[in-house]
A protein has these predicted regions:
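Nucleotide-activated donor-binding/catalytic signature segment of Leloir-type glycosyltransferases, i.e.
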Residues: 233-256
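Acidic donor-binding loop of glycosyltransferase active sites
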Residues: 259-271, 284
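Conserved acidic donor-binding segment of nucleotide-sugar-dependent glycosyltransferases
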Residues: 247, 300-301, 305-312, 319-326
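Active-site donor-binding segments of glycosyltransferases and PAPS-dependent sulfotransferases
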Residues: 27-95
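A charged, aromatic-enriched C-terminal amphipathic alpha-helix characteristic of glycosyltransferases
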Residues: 310, 323-354
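Short hydrophobic beta-strand element within catalytic cores of glycosyltransferases
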Residues: 265, 285-289, 298
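Conserved donor-binding/catalytic core segment of Leloir-type glycosyltransferases
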Residues: 183, 187-207, 211-224
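Membrane-proximal helix-turn-helix segments that form the acceptor-binding/catalytic region
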Residues: 125-155, 163
Length: 358
């Protein structure tokens, strides 16, 4: 077996999925564009890791995102060993790893290439002077993305939301296996919530933390924000005193914040969204934008409240509705258990069997 992953520069949601797969298949060689030493957990670090030529560029782990147009070439020129099965975990180019016939290729797809289809303006910017260059790059990336999709034996999507995106952009059907959430390390304390709401997120444009700040600037209710990112300074500069930025926090600290908060606020559109599931595993409701993966992980009125327009007023109204409900923490927790590590492994095993028999 061979594994493929876009890059190894930190432990985010995709790497948590990869970690569990590596734990199941410790002998599989792992192919990736870039590997930043010390950036991943023991399960991944124990694998034999092969990297692309990009690994040898000075300081690449800091500026690799600017090398996006080189990614297709880099992955296509990697040389995996012969194997019966390739499993790629991909949101960019990992699914383009060359496959030797008669090997089967199972792609666990976080999304069709995010930077080419959905969030390209957030990635490339909106500078009109660069529009012609952006058009050339997008056409190239989209053509490559569709062509390499044809070499995948079977797609597995992280949500029904992404299944529809795979069908739209690739013309391919996909199974759905939800990503694993380690709900066993999360639990209900039984204590009443403290007087603050919570955001746990990377501070980047598409997460829409700016919307939450505008809403809480108006309401003046305490809001704690966990996370770092490119928008940190800009967001902090417009936030009022009731909004506290906590920066990076350990898993244990985040768990305590989940357990203490009044609710989790999730203002952006996500492909799946692990954070809302983690908060629910601690018995806390979620206020979320009614689009994307949140529609599959949150039960409106039972484990959270949706808002349907990305405006401060709509968000504040949903928060007020959430505060007025007497929540059943055990019921909220039960919903989160649908997304456990065990459920993921069962779904993955079924997908592997189906792939090998195609």
């Amino acid at each position: 077996m061979v594994l493929a992953h876009d890059w190894l520069t930190g432990m985010r949601g995709g790497e948590r999925v990869l970690s569990l797969i590596c734990e199941q298949f410790p002998q599989a060689k792992l192919h990736t564009l870039i590997h930043k030493q010390g950036a991943v957990d023991e399960n991944i670090a124990r694998q034999v890791v092969a990297t692309s030529f990009l690994q040898h560029l000075p300081g690449i782990s800091r500026w690799y995102r600017y090398a996006l147009p080189l990614f297709p070439y880099a992955i296509e020129h990697m040389r995996p060993p012969e194997a019966d099965l390739i499993i790629s975990t991909s949101h960019c180019v990992a699914k383009g790893l060359p496959t030797h016939a008669p090997a089967k290729h199972l792609c666990y797809c976080f999304t069709p290439m995010r930077y080419a289809w959905v969030f390209y303006e957030e990635y490339f910017g909106k500078n009109p002077a660069k529009k012609w260059l952006l058009g050339l790059i997008l056409n190239y990336l989209r053509d490559w993305d569709k062509q390499t999709a044809e070499h995948v034996t079977r797609f597995v999507a992280i949500s029904h939301h992404i299944r529809k995106r795979i069908e739209k952009y690739y013309g391919r059907e996909a199974d759905v296996v939800y990503p694993p959430v380690d709900v066993n390390r999360l639990f209900i304390t039984g204590k009443s919530p403290q007087r603050f709401d919570l955001i746990v997120s990377a501070l980047v444009p598409y997460k829409r933390i700016d919307l939450a700040i505008k809403a809480y600037n108006q309401s003046k209710f305490p809001l704690k924000i966990v996370g770092t990112g490119t928008e940190y300074r800009a967001l902090r500069s417009v936030a009022k005193q009731n909004i506290e930025f906590l920066g990076w926090q350990s898993d244990d600290s985040i768990r305590a914040l989940y357990q203490q908060c009044r609710c989790l606020v999730f203002p952006g559109e996500e492909d799946f969204g692990i954070v809302p599931v983690e908060a629910q595993a601690c018995g806390r409701p979620v206020v979320a934008y009614a689009k994307g993966g949140a529609l599959e992980t949150i039960v409106d009125g039972q484990t959270g409240v949706f808002f349907h327009e990305q405006t401060p007023d709509a968000l504040n109204e949903a928060v007020q509705q959430c505060a007025a409900i007497e929540w059943d923490q055990e019921r909220i927790r039960k919903n989160a258990e649908r997304f456990s590590n065990e459920e993921f492994l069962i779904g993955l095993a079924q997908a592997i069997r189906r792939t090998l028999t195609m």
